[in-house]
Each structure stands twice: as C-alpha cells, then as structure tokens.
Design a protein with these regions (language model features):
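N-terminal low-complexity, Pro/Thr/Ser-rich intrinsically disordered segments
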Residues: 1-17, 75-82
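Structured core of small recognition/catalytic domains
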Residues: 112-113, 117-162, 172
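Tight coil/turn sites that cap or link beta-strands
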Residues: 49-50, 103-106, 144-145, 153
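Extracellular ectodomain segments of secreted/surface proteins
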Residues: 17-30
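Surface-exposed beta-loop interaction hotspot
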Residues: 55-98
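Conserved small-residue-rich
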Residues: 84-134
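Ligand-binding loop in jelly-roll beta-barrel domains
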Residues: 28-35, 43-44, 49-67, 151-173
Length: 173
C-alpha cells in the first residue's frame, strides 16, 4: 500500500522502511497506516489505519509502515533502555511502546541496550551527550519539535549537558 501524502499543511520529516513521520498543524487526511500521534504539548495517542488525526496545535504523526522487525536479543548484560528510572509509559500495544522521559542535568542514565528501533520527539532545547561502551562520546543539540529515528542494537548512556530536555519516545515492536 502506498503512503498517502500528508497534504499541503504537513511536512514529511522522516521516511524510511519502518516509519513516515509528518509534522502537522491541522487535521490530516485519513491514515493509510496505523500511527502514533505525538502532540508537542507532550501527549501521545495510537490511531488505527483509516482514522483521521484530530490535532490541536502542532503534532508529529508517526505512520507505522508494514515492516515490523521485532526486538533484538539483548546479549550485553545491560538493562533495556526502557523502562528506566524516571520514565513513564504512555501506551503499549502490539506495535509500539510509548514513553515520556525527562533527563536531569548532569545525571547520566544507566548504561542500557536499545533492543528496538525508536522515534524520539524532543519537547525542549538541550544537548545530550551519548557515551557508548567503547568510550566514544557524541554530543548532540536537540531543539523543541525535532524528531529523530534511531535503529536498535545500541548500548550507551545519555547525559543532559546543557539546557533542558524531555521527549516522547516511541519504541517500534
């Protein structure tokens, strides 16, 4: 099935084999796939294929393509990325688990393993430093409304080194 266009008032921000993410400000057309709608005010909802998103303000529509990959076996000995201290599960079904998480300044998350691909919608302006098992350090600035897609099979810690940061994180099953 082809992905229906987001329309004139929406912008495609990510497109790959797993998802198509639309940045929308107005109600969109009926969905061609199941989707998670993440409001930039911090809420999230699951919508079934054929539904029409009802958005109040700016939202990200995460269209879930028919390409499940399933979780990757965790052989690292480290805990899974979620749940983690301070995280709150918003919803879970057979396709996704959606988490609300706020980083604390200067406090590293426990070293963890991502067994699933994730879509992250950032709700504040801040810089996160990621440190991998081999000691590789990468610092990335994330702004309000940014969206990223990260493949699973990663082990690292994260530390908020500047600003504030909260995100709605959608794990893809």
């Amino acid at each position: 099935m082809l992905l229906q266009s987001p329309g004139d008032r929406a912008k495609t921000v990510i497109e790959n084999d797993r998802v198509a993410v639309w940045d929308v400000s107005d109600p969109a057309t009926a969905l061609s796939f199941d989707a998670v709608v993440v409001s930039l005010s911090g809420g999230a909802a699951f919508l079934s294929k054929g539904a029409t998103p009802s958005t109040a303000g700016r939202s990200m529509v995460i269209n879930l393509k028919d390409h499940p990959s399933g979780p990757i076996a965790n052989t690292t000995g480290y805990p899974l990325a979620f749940p983690r201290p301070g995280s709150r599960k918003i919803l879970e079904n057979e396709k996704v688990i959606v988490w609300d998480y706020t980083w604390s300044p200067g406090v590293a998350t426990p070293m963890h393993f991502h067994d699933k691909d994730v879509v992250v919608v950032y709700l504040d302006d801040g810089e996160l430093r990621s440190t991998s098992l081999d000691g590789n350090v990468v610092t990335n600035p994330f702004k309000f409304g940014m969206v990223t897609f990260n493949r699973g099979n990663r082990t690292h810690t994260e530390t908020l080194v500047r600003g504030k940061q909260r995100a709605i994180i959608t794990e893809l099953k």
